[in-house]
Every structure is written in structure tokens, then in C-alpha cells.
């Protein structure tokens, strides 16, 4: 009985010092990925900022953040995304 209690204490101590890989600062990529694009242009007055998704994502995308803090995925190949969305935010 004493051996199993000691073994349990050692395992518990070892588990306390183990950290998951996701807790590492090198693995903390929190950039969202997109799985569908917006089908129509957004009004420019609704846009506050934008960012690109990570290269680790399966679909490249521009994520527009609206004034209400909603994140909307858009196709970076679309003309309205480049010319109206991104350019208008860069001008401000």
C-alpha cells in the first residue's frame, strides 16, 4: 500500500510539471482560419480594420473586422476586397 501511495505521489508531481505544447509561446498562433468567403461586398462605413489569415490555414483570406467587432472572411483575389476594402482602410 505504501509503495502505491508513493508511486501515485511521484506521478502526480511529475504531471504537475508537464505542460501541454499549446501552452508554449511558440505554439500560440491564435489567428483564425476561414472556411468560406463573404459573397457580397461590405459597406465601407462598417469596416474598422483588416488582417490576413495565417499561411497555415487551408484557404487564404482577408478578415475584415467591423465596427461591431465581427470578423468577416473575404477572398483576397476579389477586386472589391483589394481595391475598396483594403485600400480604403489603408487611406484612413
UniProtKB/Swiss-Prot annotation:
CDD domains attached to this UniProt entry: Chemokine_CC (cd00272)
Compartments, as annotated in UniProt: Secreted
Entry's Gene Ontology BP terms: antimicrobial humoral immune response mediated by antimicrobial peptide; chemokine-mediated signaling pathway; eosinophil chemotaxis; G protein-coupled receptor signaling pathway; inflammatory response; positive regulation of cell migration; regulation of insulin secretion
Database matches in Pfam families: IL8
InterPro entries, A to Z: Chemokine_b/g/d (IPR039809), Chemokine_CC_CS (IPR000827), Chemokine_IL8-like_dom (IPR001811), Interleukin_8-like_sf (IPR036048)
Range of residues in the leader sequence: 1-23
Annotated GO CC locations: extracellular space
Keyword Secreted in annotation: yes
GO MF terms held by the record: CCR chemokine receptor binding; chemokine activity
Keywords: Chemotaxis, Cytokine, Disulfide bond, Inflammatory response, Secreted, Signal
Disulfide partners: 33-57, 34-73
Family statement: Belongs to the intercrine beta (chemokine CC) family.
Task of the protein: Chemoattractant for blood monocytes, memory T-helper cells and eosinophils. Causes the release of histamine from basophils and activates eosinophils. May activate several chemokine receptors including CCR1, CCR3, CCR4 and CCR5. May also be an agonist of the G protein-coupled receptor GPR75. Together with GPR75, may play a role in neuron survival through activation of a downstream signaling pathway involving the PI3, Akt and MAP kinases. By activating GPR75 may also play a role in insulin secretion by islet cells.
PANTHER family on file: C-C MOTIF CHEMOKINE 5, SMALL INDUCIBLE CYTOKINE A
Name assigned to this protein: C-C motif chemokine 5
Amino acid at each position: 500500500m505504501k509503495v502505491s501511495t508513493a508511486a501515485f505521489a511521484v506521478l502526480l508531481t511529475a504531471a504537475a510539471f508537464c505542460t501541454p505544447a499549446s501552452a508554449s509561446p511558440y505554439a500560440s498562433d491564435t489567428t483564425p482560419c476561414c472556411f468560406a468567403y463573404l459573397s457580397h461586398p461590405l459597406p465601407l462605413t462598417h469596416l474598422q480594420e483588416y488582417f490576413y489569415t495565417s499561411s497555415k490555414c487551408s484557404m487564404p483570406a482577408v478578415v475584415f473586422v467591423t465596427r461591431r467587432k465581427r470578423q468577416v472572411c473575404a477572398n483576397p483575389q476579389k477586386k472589391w476586397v483589394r481595391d475598396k476594402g483594403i485600400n480604403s482602410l489603408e487611406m484612413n
